[in-house]
């Protein structure tokens, strides 16, 4: 029985081996089929084949187990003996694993198998393991091949896509090229039409140029005819009696060619220049006062001096000389555009050996075309500019000659109104002869009055301003609003580098009053100064210091702390008080001026004496002073007396001060003021330098000129 069971196990093992071999053969066949199928199509993979083979092996093992169970039910005695043999077979069939050591011990204890059989089993197991390893390696290879195939397929797909894209791009490019060709083909008729239009335009330009040249020729002929007529009128040309009845158009044919007329014009202008040089080098007597010089100057201004040439055989010597030279022109020896072997065409300067070559060059290079006509137009513009310049220079020369022929004229009053403030004091000689001694007054060195050397001028009522305007001068000056002065001259002050005739305090107040909320910061005041006046766009350090000084100095400017910072406002009441103080005179200015009760009468006498000594024939000659001028002098005296009375009423006189003789200089101060009436271009105010109003006014008017503080 033991031998039979051993033989059964061996047979079973052989069967198992055969089964495994069959399985391996099936797997090999499946793998071959898988390869062939993988080569032919990628629908069935090797993984699915392996799963199928394993399922087939499991089904075969299950069938064997069922057969053994049915046989065990039929013979229960033999089933007990076969159980230990069935376990390894079933295990080997179901799971192709190696026999465990426990199973080996059980087999040895039961002494079922002999050592040879065990060796055979071990060899079979080793063979099975080798087959399993081979299967695993084969499986790995299959996977690698599948991956490679997938990668190749992806690469092929990408290449195909790229090729398709390239083909599409090529097709698009071809389509674009075709479209461009079609457009070009469509545009060809348009180009032809454009070329035709250009040709037509060129033809029109050529026709216009011909017309233009004809007009130029006509204009030149007219100018020549007019010039001939003017020469005939001036006596330079004498036409024979037989030719007097010829029409105007026949003048060039009868007398001169265009080249001859040009040469004649050059010679006439040369004669004029020689005469002008003779006038300049010969010298002029500027001290003549007779009427003949004035009449000659007026005639020279009306028409330039012309020297009449002697007439020979009814024609001038100039014409004879010109006609002698015209024979050389006819031979071709000279040409306006040819000289010294060089073409004189503007911008050409090509060298021509002889006149014939020049004519060929002129006909070939400077024919009637666009370039030549353009150069002709440029030359016309050059001639026009030179004519304009020549006319200006002639006018200047005529004005110079007129000025030199005339006697020295008196200077005309400037259109800008001037305020002539004459602070007149007494000289040393008048102090010695005066019956009363005068106290010393503080004076500042000023420029003396320059004596006028011209003849005495008569003061007419039209040139004398109103006396009431003179008396209102000090009071009205401060009441004129600044906006009325800046508004009409806004653009002038904005663009011209001119110092505005206002104090810094007035300008600061104007800046604050122009703002919307009547308050400005310091930077905003600076920006208003630079925006309104071009003068303040330079020397910022100087005038900005003056602005800050005025803001801190005057009480009318109030500093207010705000959320944004410190702003400046104007106290209008304080500002008006300051103005009224300046109008009436500051007590500090009046305090230092000593006066006496008899000062007014002595000053009036000294004024007349000083004016008499200062080379002013207007005041020294009573015959030339009319009623208006005498009223003016009376108004001046009244102003002086009123100022003296004002000083005396304030009680600032110092009778204890000893009188000392002092030399006082006469000076005239010219300053721009605002004209009150358009009919009064001049305002003459003559006061003494002791007046408090004058001192206060001087402080206000000189304040804008001091850049350091105010």
From Swiss-Prot:
DNA-binding region: 499-589
Biased composition, class Polar residues, residue ranges: 1-28, 310-319
Cellular component GO terms held in the UniProt record: nucleus
Intracellular or extracellular location(s): Nucleus
Segments of this protein annotated with the region CTBP1-binding: 417-421
Domain text: The leucine-zipper is required for dimerization and transcriptional repression.
UniProt name for this protein: Forkhead box protein P2
Species this protein is from: Rattus norvegicus
Gene name, Swiss-Prot/TrEMBL: Foxp2
């Amino acid at each position: 029985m033991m031998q039979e069971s051993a033989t059964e196990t061996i047979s079973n093992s052989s069967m198992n081996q055969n089964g495994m071999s069959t399985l391996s053969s099936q797997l090999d066949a499946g793998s071959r089929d898988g390869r062939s199928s993988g080569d032919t199509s990628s629908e069935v993979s090797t993984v699915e084949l392996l799963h199928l083979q394993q399922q087939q092996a499991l089904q075969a093992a299950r069938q064997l187990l069922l057969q053994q169970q049915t046989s065990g039910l039929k013979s229960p005695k033999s089933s007990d003996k076969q159980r230990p043999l069935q376990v390894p077979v079933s295990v080997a069939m179901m799971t192709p694993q190696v026999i465990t050591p426990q199973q080996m011990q059980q087999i040895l204890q039961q002494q079922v198998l002999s050592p040879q059989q065990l060796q055979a089993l071990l060899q079979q197991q080793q063979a099975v393991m080798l087959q399993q390893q081979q299967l695993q390696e084969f499986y790995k290879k299959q996977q690698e091949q599948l991956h490679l195939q997938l990668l190749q397929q992806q690469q092929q797909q990408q290449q195909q896509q790229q090729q398709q894209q390239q083909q599409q791009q090529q097709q698009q490019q071809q389509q674009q090229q075709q479209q461009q060709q079609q457009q070009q083909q469509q545009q060809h008729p348009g180009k032809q039409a454009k070329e035709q239009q250009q040709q037509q335009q060129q033809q029109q330009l050529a026709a216009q140029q011909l017309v233009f040249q004809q007009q130029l020729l006509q204009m030149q002929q007219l100018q020549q005819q007019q010039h001939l007529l003017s020469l005939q009128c001036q006596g330079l040309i004498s036409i024979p009696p037989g030719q007097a009845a010829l029409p105007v158009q026949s003048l060039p044919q009868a007398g001169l060619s265009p080249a001859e007329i040009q040469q004649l014009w050059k010679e006439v202008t040369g004669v004029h220049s020689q005469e002008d040089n003779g006038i300049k080098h010969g010298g002029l007597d500027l001290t003549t006062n007779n009427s003949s010089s004035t009449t000659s100057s007026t005639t020279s201004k009306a028409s330039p001096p012309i020297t009449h040439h002697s007439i020979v055989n009814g024609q001038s010597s100039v014409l004879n000389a010109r006609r002698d030279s015209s024979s050389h022109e006819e031979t071709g020896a000279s040409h306006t555009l040819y000289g010294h072997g060089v073409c004189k065409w503007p911008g050409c300067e090509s060298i021509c050996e002889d006149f014939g070559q020049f004519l060929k060059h002129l006909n070939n290079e400077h024919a009637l075309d666009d370039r030549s006509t353009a150069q002709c137009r440029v030359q016309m513009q050059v001639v026009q500019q030179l004519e304009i310049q020549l006319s200006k220079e002639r006018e200047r020369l005529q004005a110079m000659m007129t000025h030199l022929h005339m006697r020295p004229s008196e200077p005309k009053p400037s259109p800008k109104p001037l305020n002539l403030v004459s602070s007149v004091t007494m000289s040393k000689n008048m102090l010695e002869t005066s019956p009363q001694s005068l106290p010393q007054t503080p004076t500042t060195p000023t420029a003396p009055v320059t004596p006028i050397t011209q003849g005495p001028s008569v003061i007419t009522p039209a040139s004398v301003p109103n006396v009431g305007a003179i008396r209102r001068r000090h009071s009205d000056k401060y009441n004129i609003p600044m906006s009325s002065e800046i508004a009409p001259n806004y653009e002038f002050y904005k663009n011209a580098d001119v110092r505005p005739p206002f104090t810094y305090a007035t300008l600061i107040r104007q800046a604050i009053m122009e703002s919307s909320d009547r308050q400005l910061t310091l930077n905003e005041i600076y920006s208003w100064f630079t925006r309104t006046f071009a003068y303040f766009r330079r020397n910022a350090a100087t005038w900005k210091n003056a602005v800050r000084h005025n803001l801190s100095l005057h009480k009318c400017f109030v500093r207010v702390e705000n959320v944004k910072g410190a702003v400046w406002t104007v106290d209008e009441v304080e500002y008006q008080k300051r103005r009224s103080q300046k109008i009436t005179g500051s007590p500090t200015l009046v305090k230092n001026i000593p006066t006496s009760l008899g000062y007014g009468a002595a000053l009036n006498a000294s004024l007349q004496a000083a004016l008499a000594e200062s080379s002013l024939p207007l005041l020294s000659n009573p015959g030339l002073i009319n009623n208006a001028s005498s009223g003016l002098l009376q108004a001046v005296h009244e102003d002086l007396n009123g100022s003296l009375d004002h000083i005396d009423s304030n009680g600032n006189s110092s009778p204890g001060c000893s009188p000392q003789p002092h030399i006082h200089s006469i000076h005239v101060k010219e300053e721009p003021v605002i004209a009150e009436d358009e009919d009064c271009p001049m305002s003459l105010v003559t006061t003494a330098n002791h007046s408090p109003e004058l001192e206060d006014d001087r402080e206000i008017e000189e304040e804008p000129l001091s850049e350091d503080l105010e």
